Protein backbone atom coordinates (compact mmCIF):
# COMPACT_ATOMS: atom_id res chain seq x y z
CA UNK A 1 0.00 0.00 0.00
CA UNK A 2 1.10 3.57 -0.67
CA UNK A 3 0.44 6.17 2.00
CA UNK A 4 1.46 9.77 2.55
CA UNK A 5 4.05 10.59 5.21
CA UNK A 6 2.74 11.14 8.71
CA UNK A 7 4.30 12.66 11.82
CA UNK A 8 3.44 13.08 15.49
CA UNK A 9 4.92 13.57 18.93
CA UNK A 10 5.18 10.05 20.41
CA UNK A 11 6.09 10.97 23.98
CA UNK A 12 4.19 12.57 26.85
CA UNK A 13 3.67 16.27 26.07
CA UNK A 14 4.60 17.56 29.54
CA UNK A 15 8.02 18.25 31.05
CA UNK A 16 10.43 15.36 30.44
CA UNK A 17 14.09 14.66 29.80
CA UNK A 18 13.50 13.37 26.27
CA UNK A 19 10.86 13.91 23.60
CA UNK A 20 10.38 11.95 20.37
CA UNK A 21 8.92 13.20 17.09
CA UNK A 22 8.16 10.25 14.80
CA UNK A 23 7.75 10.19 11.00
CA UNK A 24 6.61 7.31 8.80
CA UNK A 25 6.22 7.14 5.03
CA UNK A 26 8.03 7.34 1.71
CA UNK A 27 9.08 10.97 2.25
CA UNK A 28 10.36 10.54 5.81
CA UNK A 29 14.04 10.42 4.76
CA UNK A 30 13.65 13.34 2.35
CA UNK A 31 12.01 15.47 5.05
CA UNK A 32 14.65 14.76 7.70
CA UNK A 33 17.43 15.52 5.19
CA UNK A 34 16.05 19.06 4.84
CA UNK A 35 16.00 19.92 8.54
CA UNK A 36 18.76 17.79 10.13
CA UNK A 37 22.40 18.88 10.18
CA UNK A 38 24.54 15.89 11.19
CA UNK A 39 27.66 16.47 13.32
CA UNK A 40 29.76 14.89 10.58
CA UNK A 41 28.64 15.87 7.10
CA UNK A 42 26.77 12.94 5.50
CA UNK A 43 23.79 12.21 3.28
CA UNK A 44 21.28 11.07 5.88
CA UNK A 45 19.17 9.42 3.14
CA UNK A 46 22.00 7.00 2.33
CA UNK A 47 23.00 5.88 5.82
CA UNK A 48 22.45 2.29 6.94
CA UNK A 49 19.11 1.30 8.41
CA UNK A 50 18.62 1.14 12.17
CA UNK A 51 21.39 3.63 12.94
CA UNK A 52 21.55 6.64 15.27
CA UNK A 53 22.97 10.03 14.25
CA UNK A 54 23.94 13.07 16.32
CA UNK A 55 23.34 16.63 15.12
CA UNK A 56 20.93 19.58 15.19
CA UNK A 57 17.47 20.34 13.87
CA UNK A 58 17.72 23.56 11.84
CA UNK A 59 15.03 25.58 10.08
CA UNK A 60 16.17 25.56 6.42
CA UNK A 61 14.64 28.99 5.75
CA UNK A 62 15.92 30.96 8.76
CA UNK A 63 18.83 28.68 9.75
CA UNK A 64 17.58 28.88 13.35
CA UNK A 65 18.82 25.95 15.44
CA UNK A 66 15.83 24.32 17.12
CA UNK A 67 17.57 21.67 19.24
CA UNK A 68 20.46 19.27 19.68
CA UNK A 69 19.15 15.82 18.75
CA UNK A 70 19.75 12.16 18.02
CA UNK A 71 18.01 10.94 14.86
CA UNK A 72 17.08 7.26 14.40
CA UNK A 73 16.88 6.05 10.81
CA UNK A 74 14.89 2.86 10.13
CA UNK A 75 14.34 1.84 6.53
CA UNK A 76 11.50 -0.30 5.20
CA UNK A 77 10.48 -3.08 5.32
CA UNK A 78 11.97 -4.00 8.72
CA UNK A 79 10.22 -1.29 10.71
CA UNK A 80 7.16 -0.91 12.94
CA UNK A 81 4.99 0.27 10.03
CA UNK A 82 6.94 -1.49 7.24
CA UNK A 83 7.60 2.02 5.91
CA UNK A 84 10.63 4.28 6.28
CA UNK A 85 10.61 5.59 9.85
CA UNK A 86 12.54 8.50 11.34
CA UNK A 87 12.52 9.27 15.06
CA UNK A 88 13.88 12.61 16.25
CA UNK A 89 15.04 12.27 19.86
CA UNK A 90 15.08 15.80 21.24
CA UNK A 91 14.80 17.46 24.64
CA UNK A 92 11.43 17.00 26.29
CA UNK A 93 8.77 19.59 26.99
CA UNK A 94 5.97 21.10 24.96
CA UNK A 95 7.89 23.92 23.24
CA UNK A 96 10.78 22.01 21.64
CA UNK A 97 8.77 19.00 20.47
CA UNK A 98 5.96 21.20 19.11
CA UNK A 99 8.40 23.41 17.19
CA UNK A 100 10.13 20.41 15.62
CA UNK A 101 6.79 18.81 14.72
CA UNK A 102 5.64 22.08 13.15
CA UNK A 103 8.84 22.20 11.09
CA UNK A 104 8.36 18.58 9.95
CA UNK A 105 4.77 19.31 8.88
CA UNK A 106 5.97 22.38 7.01
CA UNK A 107 8.25 20.13 4.93
CA UNK A 108 5.31 18.06 3.69
CA UNK A 109 4.34 15.55 6.37
CA UNK A 110 0.78 15.24 7.64
CA UNK A 111 -0.19 15.16 11.31
CA UNK A 112 -0.92 11.54 12.21
CA UNK A 113 -4.35 10.50 13.43
CA UNK A 114 -4.71 8.58 16.72
CA UNK A 115 -3.19 5.11 16.31
CA UNK A 116 -2.22 5.69 12.69
CA UNK A 117 1.31 4.30 13.03
CA UNK A 118 -0.05 1.01 14.40
CA UNK A 119 -2.88 1.08 11.86
CA UNK A 120 -0.27 1.19 9.09
CA UNK A 121 1.52 -1.76 10.70
CA UNK A 122 -1.78 -3.66 10.43
CA UNK A 123 -2.66 -2.52 6.91
CA UNK A 124 0.86 -3.32 5.70
CA UNK A 125 0.58 -6.85 7.11
CA UNK A 126 3.14 -6.69 9.91
CA UNK A 127 0.59 -7.44 12.64
CA UNK A 128 -2.99 -8.69 12.75
CA UNK A 129 -5.88 -6.84 14.37
CA UNK A 130 -5.66 -8.74 17.67
CA UNK A 131 -1.98 -7.81 17.93
CA UNK A 132 -2.83 -4.17 17.26
CA UNK A 133 -5.32 -4.27 20.15
CA UNK A 134 -2.57 -5.73 22.34
CA UNK A 135 -0.60 -2.51 21.83
CA UNK A 136 -3.46 -0.59 23.49
CA UNK A 137 -3.53 -3.12 26.34
CA UNK A 138 0.23 -2.72 26.91
CA UNK A 139 -0.10 1.06 27.06
CA UNK A 140 -3.05 0.84 29.48
CA UNK A 141 -1.75 -2.07 31.59
CA UNK A 142 -2.05 -1.32 35.31
CA UNK A 143 0.05 -4.26 36.55
CA UNK A 144 2.82 -6.57 35.34
CA UNK A 145 0.23 -9.36 35.05
CA UNK A 146 -1.86 -7.26 32.65
CA UNK A 147 1.28 -6.38 30.73
CA UNK A 148 2.33 -10.05 30.53
CA UNK A 149 -0.99 -11.12 29.01
CA UNK A 150 -0.89 -8.20 26.56
CA UNK A 151 2.66 -9.14 25.53
CA UNK A 152 1.48 -12.71 24.82
CA UNK A 153 -1.24 -11.33 22.57
CA UNK A 154 1.23 -8.96 20.88
CA UNK A 155 3.52 -11.83 19.84
CA UNK A 156 0.54 -13.56 18.26
CA UNK A 157 -0.87 -16.06 20.78
CA UNK A 158 -4.49 -15.15 20.04
CA UNK A 159 -3.86 -14.93 16.31
CA UNK A 160 -2.18 -18.35 16.27
CA UNK A 161 -5.15 -19.97 18.05
CA UNK A 162 -7.56 -18.36 15.59
CA UNK A 163 -5.38 -19.51 12.68
CA UNK A 164 -5.45 -23.10 13.97
CA UNK A 165 -9.26 -23.05 13.99
CA UNK A 166 -9.44 -21.38 10.58
CA UNK A 167 -7.07 -24.00 9.13
CA UNK A 168 -9.32 -26.77 10.49
CA UNK A 169 -12.38 -25.13 8.92
CA UNK A 170 -10.56 -24.69 5.62
CA UNK A 171 -9.69 -28.39 5.76
CA UNK A 172 -13.37 -29.23 6.22
CA UNK A 173 -14.31 -27.05 3.26
CA UNK A 174 -11.76 -28.83 1.07
CA UNK A 175 -13.22 -32.23 2.05
CA UNK A 176 -16.79 -31.07 1.42
CA UNK A 177 -15.96 -29.58 -1.97
CA UNK A 178 -14.27 -32.87 -2.91
CA UNK A 179 -17.44 -34.75 -1.93
CA UNK A 180 -19.51 -32.40 -4.06
CA UNK A 181 -17.25 -32.86 -7.08
CA UNK A 182 -16.57 -36.60 -6.65
CA UNK A 183 -19.50 -38.21 -4.82
CA UNK A 184 -18.98 -41.85 -3.84
CA UNK A 185 -21.44 -43.29 -1.36
CA UNK A 186 -19.03 -45.38 0.78
CA UNK A 187 -16.37 -42.69 0.87
CA UNK A 188 -18.96 -39.98 1.59
CA UNK A 189 -20.23 -41.70 4.74
CA UNK A 190 -16.70 -42.07 6.12
CA UNK A 191 -15.78 -38.49 5.20
CA UNK A 192 -18.90 -37.06 6.86
CA UNK A 193 -18.04 -38.87 10.11
CA UNK A 194 -14.55 -37.37 10.09
CA UNK A 195 -15.94 -33.93 9.23
CA UNK A 196 -18.43 -34.20 12.09
CA UNK A 197 -15.70 -35.06 14.61
CA UNK A 198 -13.52 -32.16 13.46
CA UNK A 199 -16.48 -29.75 13.58
CA UNK A 200 -17.18 -30.79 17.18
CA UNK A 201 -13.50 -30.26 18.05
CA UNK A 202 -13.68 -26.72 16.65
CA UNK A 203 -16.75 -25.98 18.82
CA UNK A 204 -14.76 -27.14 21.87
CA UNK A 205 -11.77 -24.99 20.86
CA UNK A 206 -14.01 -21.94 20.52
CA UNK A 207 -15.60 -22.66 23.91
CA UNK A 208 -12.19 -22.66 25.60
CA UNK A 209 -11.37 -19.22 24.22
CA UNK A 210 -14.80 -17.83 25.13
CA UNK A 211 -14.29 -19.06 28.70
CA UNK A 212 -11.17 -16.88 28.97
CA UNK A 213 -13.08 -13.66 28.25
CA UNK A 214 -13.92 -13.16 31.94
CA UNK A 215 -10.22 -13.40 32.80
CA UNK A 216 -9.55 -10.87 30.08
CA UNK A 217 -12.03 -8.43 31.57
CA UNK A 218 -10.48 -8.74 35.04
CA UNK A 219 -6.96 -8.27 33.72
CA UNK A 220 -7.85 -5.24 31.61
CA UNK A 221 -10.43 -3.52 33.83
CA UNK A 222 -9.43 -4.82 37.26
CA UNK A 223 -11.15 -7.18 39.69
CA UNK A 224 -14.27 -5.23 40.72
CA UNK A 225 -14.05 -5.32 44.50
CA UNK A 226 -16.82 -3.62 46.47
CA UNK A 227 -16.16 -2.53 50.04
CA UNK A 228 -19.51 -2.66 51.82
CA UNK A 229 -20.93 -2.53 55.31
CA UNK A 230 -23.14 -0.41 57.49
CA UNK A 231 -22.07 3.20 58.18
CA UNK A 232 -18.99 3.92 60.30
CA UNK A 233 -17.43 0.43 60.34
CA UNK A 234 -14.24 1.62 58.63
CA UNK A 235 -14.91 1.09 54.92
CA UNK A 236 -13.16 4.28 53.85
CA UNK A 237 -10.32 3.57 56.28
CA UNK A 238 -9.88 0.15 54.65
CA UNK A 239 -9.80 1.76 51.20
CA UNK A 240 -7.13 4.22 52.34
CA UNK A 241 -5.12 1.43 54.00
CA UNK A 242 -5.11 -0.72 50.86
CA UNK A 243 -4.22 2.27 48.69
CA UNK A 244 -1.60 3.37 51.22
CA UNK A 245 -2.86 6.94 50.87
CA UNK A 246 -5.77 9.03 52.14
CA UNK A 247 -8.21 8.95 49.25
CA UNK A 248 -11.50 8.83 51.15
CA UNK A 249 -12.71 11.12 53.94
CA UNK A 250 -12.69 9.36 57.30
CA UNK A 251 -14.86 10.69 60.16
CA UNK A 252 -16.85 9.35 63.11
CA UNK A 253 -20.06 10.62 61.52
CA UNK A 254 -22.14 7.79 60.00
CA UNK A 255 -23.06 8.30 56.34
CA UNK A 256 -20.05 10.46 55.45
CA UNK A 257 -19.44 8.61 52.15
CA UNK A 258 -22.27 9.61 49.82
CA UNK A 259 -20.64 8.99 46.43
CA UNK A 260 -19.06 5.84 45.04
CA UNK A 261 -15.24 6.14 45.13
CA UNK A 262 -13.25 4.00 42.67
CA UNK A 263 -9.48 3.48 42.81
CA UNK A 264 -7.04 0.93 41.39
CA UNK A 265 -4.55 -0.94 43.55
CA UNK A 266 -1.97 -3.55 42.59
CA UNK A 267 -2.35 -6.62 44.81
CA UNK A 268 0.54 -8.99 44.05
CA UNK A 269 0.26 -8.22 40.34
CA UNK A 270 -3.53 -8.41 40.13
CA UNK A 271 -5.26 -5.14 39.17
CA UNK A 272 -7.94 -4.54 41.80
CA UNK A 273 -10.63 -1.95 41.19
CA UNK A 274 -11.59 -0.97 44.74
CA UNK A 275 -15.04 0.56 45.08
CA UNK A 276 -15.82 2.29 48.38
CA UNK A 277 -19.59 2.42 48.78
CA UNK A 278 -21.94 4.41 50.95
CA UNK A 279 -22.91 2.66 54.18
CA UNK A 280 -25.99 0.51 53.61
CA UNK A 281 -28.80 1.36 56.01
CA UNK A 282 -32.38 2.68 56.03
CA UNK A 283 -32.28 6.46 55.85
CA UNK A 284 -34.66 9.33 55.11
CA UNK A 285 -31.85 11.71 54.11
CA UNK A 286 -32.20 12.11 50.31
CA UNK A 287 -28.52 12.34 49.30
CA UNK A 288 -27.50 9.43 51.54
CA UNK A 289 -30.46 7.42 50.22
CA UNK A 290 -29.16 7.87 46.65
CA UNK A 291 -25.73 6.70 47.82
CA UNK A 292 -27.23 3.56 49.37
CA UNK A 293 -29.07 2.79 46.11
CA UNK A 294 -25.81 3.16 44.17
CA UNK A 295 -24.09 0.82 46.65
CA UNK A 296 -26.65 -1.91 45.98
CA UNK A 297 -26.12 -1.49 42.22
CA UNK A 298 -22.35 -1.90 42.70
CA UNK A 299 -22.96 -5.12 44.66
CA UNK A 300 -24.76 -6.67 41.70
CA UNK A 301 -21.75 -6.09 39.39
CA UNK A 302 -18.91 -6.87 41.83
CA UNK A 303 -16.53 -9.82 41.31
CA UNK A 304 -15.56 -9.77 44.99
CA UNK A 305 -17.07 -8.21 48.10
CA UNK A 306 -15.18 -7.07 51.18
CA UNK A 307 -17.90 -7.00 53.83
CA UNK A 308 -16.57 -4.82 56.64
CA UNK A 309 -17.81 -5.48 60.19
CA UNK A 310 -16.95 -3.63 63.39
CA UNK A 311 -15.32 -6.00 65.92
CA UNK A 312 -15.86 -3.45 68.71
CA UNK A 313 -19.66 -3.57 68.32
CA UNK A 314 -22.25 -6.30 68.42
CA UNK A 315 -23.95 -7.37 65.20
CA UNK A 316 -27.01 -5.27 64.45
CA UNK A 317 -30.14 -5.47 62.33
CA UNK A 318 -28.31 -3.47 59.63
CA UNK A 319 -25.55 -6.11 59.45
CA UNK A 320 -28.13 -8.89 59.08
CA UNK A 321 -29.95 -7.00 56.30
CA UNK A 322 -26.69 -6.73 54.35
CA UNK A 323 -26.04 -10.47 54.83
CA UNK A 324 -29.41 -11.16 53.22
CA UNK A 325 -28.51 -9.44 49.93
CA UNK A 326 -25.12 -11.15 49.46
CA UNK A 327 -26.29 -14.57 48.27
CA UNK A 328 -24.13 -16.16 45.59
CA UNK A 329 -21.26 -13.68 45.87
CA UNK A 330 -17.52 -14.15 46.48
CA UNK A 331 -17.15 -12.60 49.93
CA UNK A 332 -14.34 -11.89 52.35
CA UNK A 333 -15.62 -10.85 55.78
CA UNK A 334 -13.29 -8.15 57.09
CA UNK A 335 -13.46 -7.83 60.88
CA UNK A 336 -12.15 -4.30 61.47
CA UNK A 337 -11.11 -2.44 64.65
CA UNK A 338 -9.55 -5.47 66.37
CA UNK A 339 -7.26 -3.02 68.21
CA UNK A 340 -10.31 -2.12 70.34
CA UNK A 341 -11.99 -4.36 72.94
CA UNK A 342 -13.87 -7.05 71.00
CA UNK A 343 -17.65 -7.08 71.48
CA UNK A 344 -18.80 -8.97 68.41
CA UNK A 345 -20.10 -12.49 69.12
CA UNK A 346 -17.69 -14.75 67.18
CA UNK A 347 -19.96 -17.82 67.33
CA UNK A 348 -22.86 -15.78 65.98
CA UNK A 349 -20.56 -14.42 63.27
CA UNK A 350 -19.36 -17.90 62.21
CA UNK A 351 -22.93 -19.19 62.07
CA UNK A 352 -23.93 -16.21 59.98
CA UNK A 353 -20.98 -16.42 57.56
CA UNK A 354 -21.42 -20.20 57.17
CA UNK A 355 -17.69 -20.77 57.73
CA UNK A 356 -16.79 -18.15 55.13
CA UNK A 357 -13.43 -16.37 55.01
CA UNK A 358 -12.97 -13.99 57.96
CA UNK A 359 -9.91 -11.73 58.10
CA UNK A 360 -9.24 -9.68 61.23
CA UNK A 361 -7.71 -6.26 60.60
CA UNK A 362 -7.02 -2.93 62.21
CA UNK A 363 -6.77 -0.15 59.66
CA UNK A 364 -5.44 2.15 62.40
CA UNK A 365 -2.63 -0.19 63.53
CA UNK A 366 -2.12 -1.67 60.02
CA UNK A 367 -2.78 -5.21 61.30
CA UNK A 368 -4.00 -7.98 58.99
CA UNK A 369 -3.76 -6.02 55.73
CA UNK A 370 -1.11 -8.29 54.23
CA UNK A 371 -3.20 -11.35 55.11
CA UNK A 372 -6.17 -9.73 53.38
CA UNK A 373 -4.11 -9.11 50.22
CA UNK A 374 -2.84 -12.72 50.27
CA UNK A 375 -6.41 -13.98 50.62
CA UNK A 376 -7.56 -11.95 47.60
CA UNK A 377 -4.63 -13.29 45.57
CA UNK A 378 -5.36 -16.91 46.57
CA UNK A 379 -9.06 -16.55 45.78
CA UNK A 380 -8.17 -15.45 42.27
CA UNK A 381 -5.55 -18.05 41.43
CA UNK A 382 -7.14 -21.10 43.01
CA UNK A 383 -10.10 -20.58 40.69
CA UNK A 384 -12.80 -19.14 42.97
CA UNK A 385 -12.66 -16.10 40.72
CA UNK A 386 -12.15 -16.65 36.99
CA UNK A 387 -8.46 -16.09 36.29
CA UNK A 388 -5.60 -18.42 35.44
CA UNK A 389 -2.01 -17.46 34.77
CA UNK A 390 -1.51 -19.90 31.92
CA UNK A 391 -4.45 -19.13 29.67
CA UNK A 392 -4.79 -16.91 26.62
CA UNK A 393 -7.33 -14.18 27.31
CA UNK A 394 -9.57 -12.40 24.86
CA UNK A 395 -11.44 -9.11 24.91
CA UNK A 396 -15.17 -8.46 24.53
CA UNK A 397 -14.90 -7.88 20.77
CA UNK A 398 -13.17 -11.22 20.29
CA UNK A 399 -15.79 -12.88 22.51
CA UNK A 400 -18.67 -11.60 20.38
CA UNK A 401 -17.05 -12.90 17.18
CA UNK A 402 -16.30 -16.27 18.83
CA UNK A 403 -19.89 -16.63 20.06
CA UNK A 404 -21.11 -16.03 16.51
CA UNK A 405 -18.53 -18.46 15.09
CA UNK A 406 -19.63 -21.09 17.62
CA UNK A 407 -23.26 -20.60 16.60
CA UNK A 408 -22.39 -21.29 12.95
CA UNK A 409 -20.23 -24.30 13.86
CA UNK A 410 -23.04 -25.77 15.99
CA UNK A 411 -25.38 -25.25 13.04
CA UNK A 412 -22.81 -27.06 10.90
CA UNK A 413 -22.77 -30.01 13.33
CA UNK A 414 -26.58 -30.18 13.27
CA UNK A 415 -26.57 -30.08 9.46
CA UNK A 416 -24.07 -32.96 9.22
CA UNK A 417 -26.00 -35.04 11.79
CA UNK A 418 -29.25 -34.26 9.98
CA UNK A 419 -27.88 -35.46 6.66
CA UNK A 420 -28.14 -32.08 4.94
CA UNK A 421 -26.33 -31.45 1.66
CA UNK A 422 -22.67 -30.45 1.51
CA UNK A 423 -23.65 -27.12 -0.08
CA UNK A 424 -25.67 -26.12 3.00
CA UNK A 425 -22.91 -27.21 5.38
CA UNK A 426 -20.33 -25.06 3.56
CA UNK A 427 -22.53 -21.98 4.12
CA UNK A 428 -22.18 -22.36 7.91
CA UNK A 429 -18.45 -23.06 7.65
CA UNK A 430 -17.84 -19.94 5.55
CA UNK A 431 -19.89 -17.87 8.00
CA UNK A 432 -17.77 -19.19 10.90
CA UNK A 433 -14.59 -18.33 8.96
CA UNK A 434 -15.90 -14.80 8.43
CA UNK A 435 -16.44 -14.33 12.19
CA UNK A 436 -12.97 -15.63 13.07
CA UNK A 437 -11.50 -13.34 10.42
CA UNK A 438 -12.99 -10.35 12.25
CA UNK A 439 -10.72 -11.10 15.21
CA UNK A 440 -7.50 -11.06 13.22
CA UNK A 441 -8.75 -8.46 10.75
CA UNK A 442 -9.08 -10.26 7.40
CA UNK A 443 -12.86 -9.77 7.30
CA UNK A 444 -13.17 -6.75 9.61
CA UNK A 445 -15.08 -3.80 8.16
CA UNK A 446 -13.43 -0.44 7.63
CA UNK A 447 -15.69 1.09 10.30
CA UNK A 448 -14.60 -1.53 12.85
CA UNK A 449 -10.93 -1.02 12.03
CA UNK A 450 -11.28 2.76 12.38
CA UNK A 451 -13.15 2.36 15.68
CA UNK A 452 -10.33 0.24 17.13
CA UNK A 453 -7.52 2.59 16.12
CA UNK A 454 -9.39 5.68 17.33
CA UNK A 455 -8.86 4.34 20.86
CA UNK A 456 -5.10 4.85 20.50
CA UNK A 457 -3.21 7.98 21.46
CA UNK A 458 -1.66 10.19 18.78
CA UNK A 459 1.89 9.09 18.00
CA UNK A 460 1.38 5.34 18.43
Swiss-Prot record:
Keywords from the named record: Cytoplasm, GTP-binding, Hydrolase, Magnesium, Metal-binding, Nucleotide-binding, Potassium, tRNA processing
Recorded GO CC terms: cytosol
Binding site for K(+): 232, 251, 253, 256
Xref: Pfam families: MMR_HSR1, MnmE_helical, TrmE_N
Signal peptide: none
Enzyme nomenclature, EC number: 3.6.-.-
InterPro entries in the cross-refs: G_TrmE, GTP-bd, GTP-bd_TrmE_N, GTPase_MnmE, MnmE_dom2, MnmE_helical, P-loop_NTPase, Small_GTP-bd
Domain spans labelled TrmE-type G: 222-381
Lineage top rank: taxon: Bacteria
Recorded GO MF terms: GTP binding; GTPase activity; metal ion binding
Subcellular localization(s) per the UniProt record: Cytoplasm
Annotated positions binding (6S)-5-formyl-5,6,7,8-tetrahydrofolate: 22, 87, 126, 460
Cofactor binding description: Binds 1 potassium ion per subunit.
Segments traversing the membrane: none
Binding-site positions, GTP: 232-237, 251-257, 276-279
Sites where the protein binds Mg(2+): 236, 257
HAMAP family named among the record's database cross-references: GTPase_MnmE (MF_00379)
Subunit text: Homodimer. Heterotetramer of two MnmE and two MnmG subunits.
Function: Exhibits a very high intrinsic GTPase hydrolysis rate. Involved in the addition of a carboxymethylaminomethyl (cmnm) group at the wobble position (U34) of certain tRNAs, forming tRNA-cmnm(5)s(2)U34.
Protein name as annotated: tRNA modification GTPase MnmE
Source organism (scientific name): Thermoanaerobacter pseudethanolicus (strain ATCC 33223 / 39E)
Gene: mnmE
Amino acid sequence: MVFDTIAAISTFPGEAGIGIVRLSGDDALEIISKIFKPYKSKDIKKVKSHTLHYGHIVDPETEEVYDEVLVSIMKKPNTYTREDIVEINCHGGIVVTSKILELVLKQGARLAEPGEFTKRAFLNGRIDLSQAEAVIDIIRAKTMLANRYAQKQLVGYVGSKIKEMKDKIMGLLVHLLALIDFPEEDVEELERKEILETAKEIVEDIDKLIASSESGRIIREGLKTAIIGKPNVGKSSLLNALLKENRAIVTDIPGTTRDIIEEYVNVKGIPIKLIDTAGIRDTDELVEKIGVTKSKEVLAEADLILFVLDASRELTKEDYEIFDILTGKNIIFVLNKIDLPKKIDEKELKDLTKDGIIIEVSTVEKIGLEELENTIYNLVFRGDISLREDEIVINSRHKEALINAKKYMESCVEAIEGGYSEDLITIDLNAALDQLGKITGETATEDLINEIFERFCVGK
